[in-house]
Amino acid sequence: MKKDDSLKKFKYKVAAFYNFISIIDEEILLIKEELTNLATNQKIKGTILLASEGVNGTICGTENAIVLFIETLENLLKVSDINVKYSWCERQAFRRFKARKKKEIVTIGLKEINPTKSVGKYIKAGEWNQFLEDPDSVVIDTRNDYEIKIGNFAGALNPQTSSFREFPAWVQKHLKPLIEENPSLKIGMYCTGGIRCEKATSYLIEEGFSDVHHLEGGILKYLEDVSSENSLWNGECFVFDQRVSLDHELLPGSHRMCHACGLPISPEDLKKPTYIKGLQCDACVNKFTDSDRARFAERQRQIDEIMKRLPENSIWPSS
């Protein structure tokens, strides 16, 4: 039985998807309108980014609604193979639905990078362990540092970036010298759902790197296809929604979100004396003024009042 089938007891299905495909402005506006109307009618929530290079998004709703949404999106894009990963949860993972037109669906900040024309070689989830253990390979985690800290593949390089825009500078300063000294190394990259590492491979190819690979479907596809017994994944996978993190079974993990700084906080962080619910965590204890914390405290008070009036399990725990 597939992991996805065993989780159908949960009310909500989450779809994380992307597709690098050329879209003209008129089509972007049409797609945005169609998807917004569909999301409203089907009570789907989430975030969709549309740009001339494609579409990127994560949505949450009932299974039938999600199936209809993905089918509609594929029809609008005139494709039949959009890259999509599924997971389940007992509560709505988003507060609202947003569809936005952007310059890029994942921002690297370089106009000349075009993943619709050139990307690296895909590595299937079932073949990823072999690549990780290959002494002639170097593996790079293209996610942000705060994501990597809560879960990663051991031995992967951490560029220690706070945004994807910083990745090219890291490549020039660190990766390029490494490959110049070790030209036979194969390069493998991974990210949450496949989009960042796919665009990263496009950048490396543009910069003249060869033998560039990336994990198809990202960490989410790996966790879906590879059993925990055979897995080389450590920790939890950060996701950009109310669940904050997922465990190896693709269920909501143990992390929460600090409402002050927006970083994930672990159960251990919640026990630290620096942690104050809604006001600060250990990572941001020195980042805000008393005026900021007064605003945070009022916001937390309002959140607590709202939660008292809502049915149990209708909203994620506040931190």
Swiss-Prot record:
It catalyses: uridine(34) in tRNA + AH2 + O2 = 5-hydroxyuridine(34) in tRNA + A + H2O. The active site is at C191. Residues 133-231 form the Rhodanese domain. One of its GO terms (molecular function) is oxidoreductase activity, acting on paired donors, with incorporation or reduction of molecular oxygen. SMART domains: RHOD. InterPro entries: Rhodanese-like_dom, Rhodanese-like_dom_sf, TrhO, TRHO_N. The keyword Ribonucleoprotein does not apply. NCBIfam families: PRK00142.1-4. Belongs to the TrhO family. This is tRNA uridine(34) hydroxylase. The lineage of its organism: Bacteria, Bacillati, Cyanobacteriota, Cyanophyceae, Synechococcales.
